[in-house]
Amino acid sequence: MSNFTAEDKAAITSLWGKVNVEDAGGETLGRLLVVYPWTQRFFDSFGSLSSPSAIMGNPKVKAHGVKVLTSLGEAIKNLDDLKGTFGQLSELHCDKLHVDPENFRLLGNVLVTVLAILHGKEFTPEVQASWQKMVAGVASALASRYH
């Protein structure tokens, strides 16, 4: 079951087709680590995260950001089954990595900010509403193993 209207799906997929996953992924994860520094504890193996410039210039941050957004691309292909799409990732983040599920919500909100920056006037309030709905759905799907 999906709460996404045809308009939501069109807004999400249309913008997604214009997203540069490398740029947006690195920017999104980097901003998460800068704005919410307690999230850095999950990335000890990434090397120096000692300052905003170290984080934003860190190739491991960028690479993982690409991985995150690539996974999001799979979600966009499966908007009607986000929980199924993220079942294994939810299990990994809950059982092995012990990530606080609130971090998924924070990451989604940072992504929306990055998309607004990168896509300017194209990121209308209607497009934002659809993307907020989608990132909330992804956060809920990723947190599903915790319940």
From Swiss-Prot:
> Which PROSITE patterns does the record cross-reference, listed alphabetically?
GLOBIN
A cellular component term from Gene Ontology for this protein is: hemoglobin complex
Which family does the UniProt entry place this protein in?
Answer: Belongs to the globin family.
Subunit text = Heterotetramer of two alpha chains and two gamma chains in fetal hemoglobin (Hb F).
Give the signal sequence positions: none
Query: Per the database record, which ranges form the Globin domain?
Result: 3-147
Name one molecular function that GO assigns to this entry: heme binding
Please tell me where heme b binds in this chain.
H64, H93
Pfam families assigned? Globin (PF00042)
Coiled coil residues, start to end: none
| Keyword Iron among UniProt keywords | yes
- CDD domains referenced in this protein's UniProt entry, alphabetically: Hb-beta-like
Protein name according to UniProt: Hemoglobin subunit gamma
Task: Name the organs or tissues of expression.
Answer: Red blood cells.
In the UniProt record, the gene name given for this protein reads HBG
